[in-house]
Swiss-Prot record:
Pfam family, one: Corazonin
Descriptive protein name: Pro-corazonin
Domain of life from the UniProt record: Eukaryota
Keywords, ordered alphabetically: Amidation, Cleavage on pair of basic residues, Neuropeptide, Pyrrolidone carboxylic acid, Secreted, Signal
Residue list for modification Asparagine amide: 31
Known role: Cardioactive peptide. Corazonin is probably involved in the physiological regulation of the heart beat. Clock (Clk) and cycle (cyc) proteins negatively regulate Crz transcription in a cell-specific manner.
Modification sites for Pyrrolidone carboxylic acid: 21
GO CC annotations on file: extracellular region; extracellular space
Propeptide segments, given as residue ranges: 64-153
InterPro entries on file: Procorazonin
Amino acid sequence: MLRLLLLPLFLFTLSMACMGQTFQYSRGWTNGKRAPPAALVTNGHNLGLLDIYDIQDRPTDIKLERCLLQLQHFVGNALLHRSFANGLAYSASRPDPETDVRSINIHSRPGSGNNNIENSLYPNVNHRQSNELFEALNAPGPDAVEPNDYGKH
């Protein structure tokens, strides 16, 4: 009889211990691997993590920029084209923030600290692509969209 009662008690205790561990490590009691980046930076006292999270966001922004351009091309809305072109003009006038990050990054490419882009082995290709997109959006041609063209279809 005692063995019959101990088996469910043991299974219940084991399941509660597993659930407690899962909650502890995944929901933030100890800032486990699923904790948000802000909690890791504030509680980790490691300022180097800030640079890592900034670097991870940049490729996503480039992919979103390309996706937005394709969407605008298929939709053909002139207002979206103008707002995107204004955003590109604004970002082209700002200084490149990647130079500060590359000076800190251990794995930076050779020649990335050089301000002269023509002499660099690895020029900033993404900036050039943005300028080409900006020129393509503002250039008149067979793909030019009239403001009232969207309403005609």
